[in-house]
Structure formats: C-alpha cells, structure tokens
Amino acid sequence: MNIFEELKARGLVFQTTDEQALVKALTEGQVSYYTGYDPTADSLHLGHLVAILTSRRLQLAGHKPYALVGGATGLIGDPSFKDAERSLQTKETVLEWSDKIKGQLSTFLDFENGDNKAELVNNYDWFSQISFIDFLRDVGKYFTVNYMMSKDSVKKRIETGISYTEFAYQIMQGYDFYELNDKHNVTLQIGGSDQWGNMTAGTELLRKKADKTGHVMTVPLITDSTGKKFGKSEGNAVWLDADKTSPYEMYQFWLNVMDDDAVRFLKIFTFLSLDEIAEIETQFNAARHERLAQKTLAREVVTLVHGEEAYKQALNITEQLFAGNIKNLSANELKQGLSNVPNYHVQSIDNHNIVEILVAAKISPSKRQAREDVQNGAIYINGDRVQDLDYQLSNDDKIDDQLTVIRRGKKKYAVLTY
C-alpha cells in the first residue's frame, strides 16, 4: 500500500487536483509540500490536527514538509465560510501568536533529522517586502474578478458583504504557493476542505505565471456521527496548549467520543497501523461497554500531543476521581480533574463550620438542607464522610495548602480555595 492509498484508507483524502498525477509524484520520488496555519489564536486546536498528522504521515513516507505560519495572511483574515468579517488583530499580537504556533508544530513534525526534515516559514517574510503596486502588477493581474467571485467561500459572503481586504485573501494564499515553489520547489499544498478555493488559486497562479503544475489535496472537515463539527467540548475549542485545555480535559474529550465515531477517529488521529485498528475494532464490537476504542484513542492522542507522563497523569486522575480517592491526588491534579466544578474562595474571616460552608459554597441550598445532608451522611470532605454538625474546616483539610474538595452525594462537587 503506497502512502496515498493509506491516506485514502484512513479517510484523509477529501479532494485533489489531478489524482493520477499526484499519486505518480508521490510514488516516484520525494515531494516537497506545505500546509498553512494562520495565527487566529495563540494556540492550534484539534481542528488543525487532521492536517498536521497528515503532514507527518507524508514525512514518515519520505516527503519533505514545509509548515507555513501565516504571519501576513493572519493580519488579513480568511473569509472562507465565515458568516461575518473577522476582527483584525494587531501586528504584535499576530507575530506573538505565530511564534507560539511554530513551537507547537515542532511537537509533531521532525525539524532535525534527514534530508526531508521539516522547514518552518512565515509568509510575513515575503509579503512585508512587496509593495502594493508590485503586488497588483506581478500577482493581481493573473486573477480575474469573475474567477475570484466564483469561489464558494466568496459567494456565501456576497449578499451580506465582504471587504476588499478579505476578498483579496485568496490571492495572498495563492502567492504563498508560488513563492514556496519558486524558492523551495514545493509542488503540493495540503489543507482543510474549506480551503479548496484558496488553495486552487495557488495552482492557478503557478500555471499562469510560471507555467508549472502544482497539486492540491484537501483533508475532510471532521464531523461526528450526528453531523456536528468535531473538535469542541461544551462549545469550546479543544486546544493543543496544555494551559488552555489540560491533558486531563483532552483525555476526557476522547474518552467520551461516541461508539459510532471511535474506530474512524483511530484511523484519522493515531499512528496505529490499519491492521492494529482492525483488531481493536473486532474486540471493541464484541464488548462495547468496555470502551476499548475510546480508551485507545485517548491514550494515543494525549501521548502524541502532551507526552506519556501527561497521559499517565490524566489516566490516574480519572481513576482516582472515579473511586473517590481525592487524597491520592495533588492540588494541581485536582485542578485539572475538577476544572469545571464550582469554586468558592474561603476568606479567613468566614465561619468555617461545615454547615455554613455548605451554604456559602452553594453546595446545599439552605442551612436546614445542609444539616440534613451532613446528618444523612451525604457530605464528603476530600473523600471522607463528615456527619458532625459542629465540624470545623482546618488546615488539615487543605490539600497542598491550596484547596479542599467537598462532595454532596455521588456527583455534586465544589472546590474550596484559600
């Protein structure tokens, strides 16, 4: 099975320009290719991971990746399938975000070894050197307005309005391909399926300005089995930055993937072989309640993104919280595991009686209910049941001198901080 056949088998090929020519190029020698990442935030997220891992698969097959950070295009804003104009960021912000994204990409691509080691480029380096007049004369003349308006990404914005700034975005992305081909002999661009219009602007410019053929391959935008856009948890993006989405939160995200999606996601998001995945699928279908596919997915992706130690910590947090063993976890681990739990900051002047604290922290709705909860054995402090109405919180209840975990019943948690 050649690399293109494997990508197809994993569900990673959505659309290509001349497929036969692309397969020929990939099987006959080393291909230099690029994927672009606009710095629209200070971190990449799970939505970017499909293209990143596809790029890594091609590198493992001997091809040479260029990771393009869009320091210039990030200043403009991509209109593709957006309902409204993006807010423009300052140059300083975009350059800062660009540096952070460069650091994240080095986790996945090999920038050190071999003749196909990855290269980082930033399109701000060339766009900052081109005058507006030169750009119009040397690049703009190759694009008709009719051609630019025929793109689906633009059509959807015509009625609501699109600025010239965003309208010109596709020309800038097209010029990226031309520049990388001219300087580094890059002949293939990889990106999300929503980028098809912008990407083919590059092959068009190559053909007209340099009389060369370029290839484009898009990866699918991933949705779950209900058709919902994949990569968000509770409406929030799942970030690759551990400070924005903790390894534990990422682990839980993958653990909660639906049965109908789990095996498909193993093919897309892990480097397990297709034979290994087929074996997991057989075991998974025989005992779905054991969630083997989800557990494997969580292990593989968290290890890939954050490392083995982070995976082990996420697994330990999961197991200890499930067992109610709060005291077996550090304050930092509890902050990860209980990040979505209500917090109450205890002041030194507060009454530290258990009943008062339960009401103040909104664990129990009233003092009467709080007393009943304590007497009925429904209240736990750091995993230990408390039934004494006169119980006073003390330093002994602080984990690492930072927090106390209170549980009411089986599932209602609150974290007290000091």
Swiss-Prot record:
Family: Belongs to the class-I aminoacyl-tRNA synthetase family. TyrS type 1 subfamily.
Cystine residue pairs: none
Localization per record: Cytoplasm
One annotated GO biological process: tyrosyl-tRNA aminoacylation
Gene that this sequence comes from: tyrS
Subunit (UniProt): Homodimer.
Superkingdom classification of source: Bacteria
Catalytic activity: tRNA(Tyr) + L-tyrosine + ATP = L-tyrosyl-tRNA(Tyr) + AMP + diphosphate + H(+)
Binding, ATP: 232
Record-listed E.C. numbers: 6.1.1.1
All residue ranges annotated as the S4 RNA-binding domain in the record: 352-418
HAMAP family documented for this protein: Tyr_tRNA_synth_type1
Enzyme class, broadest EC rank: ligase
PROSITE patterns xref list: AA_TRNA_LIGASE_I (PS00178), S4 (PS50889)
Residues reported in the UniProt entry to bind L-tyrosine: 34, 169, 173
Motif ('HIGH' region): 39-48
Annotated motif 'KMSKS' region, positions: 229-233
Any one GO molecular-function label of the UniProt entry: RNA binding
Annotated function: Catalyzes the attachment of tyrosine to tRNA(Tyr) in a two-step reaction: tyrosine is first activated by ATP to form Tyr-AMP and then transferred to the acceptor end of tRNA(Tyr).
Gene Ontology annotations for the cellular component aspect, listed alphabetically: cytosol
Family matches, as NCBIfam families: tyrS (TIGR00234)
UniProt keyword list: Aminoacyl-tRNA synthetase, ATP-binding, Cytoplasm, Ligase, Nucleotide-binding, Protein biosynthesis, RNA-binding
Taxonomic classification: Bacteria, Bacillati, Bacillota, Bacilli, Lactobacillales
Stored Pfam families: SYY_C-terminal, tRNA-synt_1b
Name by which UniProt lists this protein: Tyrosine--tRNA ligase
